[in-house]
Amino acid sequence: MHPQELSNPAGAIRWWVYQRERFPILANGTLIMAFSSSAVCFSSLLREEQGLPHWSAFAAAFITSFIFFLQLRIADEFKDSEEDEKFQPYRAVPRGLVTLRELGFVFLIGAFIQLGIALWLYPPLVGILLIAWAYLGLMSREFFVREWIKSRPVTYLWTHMGIMPLVDLYATATEWMPRGATVPDGLIWFLVVSFFNGVVIEVGRKIRSTDEEKPGVSTYTKLWGQRGAPLIWFGFLLVTAISASIAGSLIEFG
């Protein structure tokens, strides 16, 4: 059944429906756990540490990263609200399942949890957290050039993927900062991989067949064509693989 054909449930069940439609906890949580754990382990391996990193680094990296990705979803709900109302009224916010005010409250609760974790694990982590928040805030406001950036899809893509290395930097920092270390040599390649991973996912999810295209909904197949978009996506995938190979060589992986 299409979401627009569903009635909106009442009470707490609304949030279960919201996560199912807009931010599946199990699916996203599994990916984010792999994302954050690899960041912690990569940092430790770069510094040639023996044994597994402390559990607190894994926990802090996972919870904070999970909240970051939830905040990204909520930020999208805000900045896309007018377009969703017009072109995709069946989505959760336009159809009244949850309100933007409620989502904003969830966003703030998440931020307080992130802050609390940083202060608990190692207070200087707050510095990186603030940088990531600031970038997320700029993204939410379309860098204060909404019409300009929306008319330039490639610029829109790379500026919005800039958040990925920042989230990954924070995740790695939960391992190296509490130990009094500096940014590990070679970490830049891991951040490059995270950037292009984000690009691959973002471009891939907006490649549609002709009959799946919808009026008013931007896709990369509309921008680059039915043949061009998959080819460009494959190019990004290749760059990601090369970057990952370089990063892997730094820890003698593979």
Which sequence ranges carry the predicted segments?
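Small-residue-rich segments of transmembrane alpha-helices in multi-pass membrane proteins
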Residues: 33-38, 94-97, 155-173, 221-228
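Transmembrane alpha-helical segments that form the membrane-embedded catalytic/substrate-channel core
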Residues: 66-75, 134-145, 165-173, 191-211
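Multi-pass membrane catalytic core of lipid/isoprenoid biosynthesis enzymes
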Residues: 87-129, 224-251
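Intramembrane alpha-helical segments
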Residues: 16, 20, 102-177
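Cytosolic, membrane-interface loops and tails of multi-pass inner-membrane proteins
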Residues: 2-17, 77-95, 202-230
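Topogenic membrane-insertion module of multi-pass membrane proteins
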Residues: 1-77, 147-150, 160-163
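Helix-coil boundary and interhelical linker segments in multi-pass alpha-helical membrane proteins
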Residues: 39-61, 113-127, 166-192, 243-254
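Membrane-water interface at loop-to-transmembrane-helix junctions
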Residues: 153-157, 183-190, 220-233
